[in-house]
């Protein structure tokens, strides 16, 4: 029997870490060599002080040569996806070109590309791009939606009604300013060398706001041999009066024709930036009243949180498909499992008041949840002190847990979500 093929998998945390362990334990399956650190948890985040994409990629490329890697991958937005592309380039392995990753992840450059290839799906952007810790210049039209040119997890992304609100948003303390700079600088350094026309990533993008009544959706897909294909669309449901996600549901309620339009936009954008292989997810709004589809961004990586939803409802494994692409194999050849649910959801528990953050479930509550929901997936995300305060400052809320559940239909899903929330001692919203 031939030896299992080995791959490098970078910054595999949470959903990706679970998938890496599951796939790596499969008999006869590939074996994974992990690398990276948790940039939001101590002590791993101390490594951010000295992190350099090129140095990290060179070290991992040397490791890959020594271990005989057949592929490399990462779905980590902030650091991993670009690092995997750099390593694949150095080792001559399958993967997206680093310039394509840069073009998609630099939100200012990506917006300009989208305006050229799919203007009907692009939000209007103001030419002014202030940086963190800068005073907002004159001439900005309010209200506007503000987000970092290079960001992740909706950090520092929100609508601001006036100049005073924007100034408060950009007013960082010394530690916050340092952290924001360090999060972006490794990316900006590569961008200056490989995509200089994009401009500085240490900036904020100002876009036209979209009414809160307009729902958000996520198209997941993959590219192989230059062909762009869809996995499906996941619907976002938000907390009332906010853009904060309450849950994600699959399958989507969007008409098939609208889903096809989203795929067409993704195809044009990915072709324009030269993204030829890998997974992607396209975040977009769709306003049924005006029939307008507006792209938020296109991420050149798997939306890892949703992989479990596809496994439950369709019996397909997006993480396994990503591994196949990293090995230059056809993901469609992978076997499908029997679906176990008609609908599935990723429930996101948030607090909007620092004084109202519930404690994480203790051992008894976790055991009760496991007994009642053997199919359930529980991910507590507790924070305290400065990390908790930073969540409220940068995101406007604190995400303290996620639960995944499946059901035969949406009515049963709501019932199961209420029961699970009660067992965990967490607030239930639907």
Go through the PLM ranges and name each one:
Residues 158, 207-208, 399-407:
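Short, well-ordered beta-strand elements within core beta-sheets of diverse protein domains
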Residues 1-100, 116, 131-132, 328-329, ...:
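ATP-binding N-terminal substructure of ATP-dependent carboxylate-amine bond-forming enzymes
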Residues 170-238, 261-264, 285-294:
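Phosphate-binding site of ATP-dependent enzymes
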Residues 261-282, 300-358:
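Active-site "cap" helix and flanking loop/linker of ATP-utilizing ligase/carboxylase catalytic domains
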Residues 133-135, 166-168, 292, 354-360, ...:
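Short, conserved charged micro-motifs
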Residues 84-86, 291-301:
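A short beta-strand motif that forms the metal-chelation/ATP-contact edge
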Residues 85, 89-159, 163, 174-194:
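A conserved helix-loop-beta module that forms one wall/lid of the active-site cleft
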Residues 350-384:
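Glycine-rich active-site loop/lid that clamps phosphate-bearing ligands
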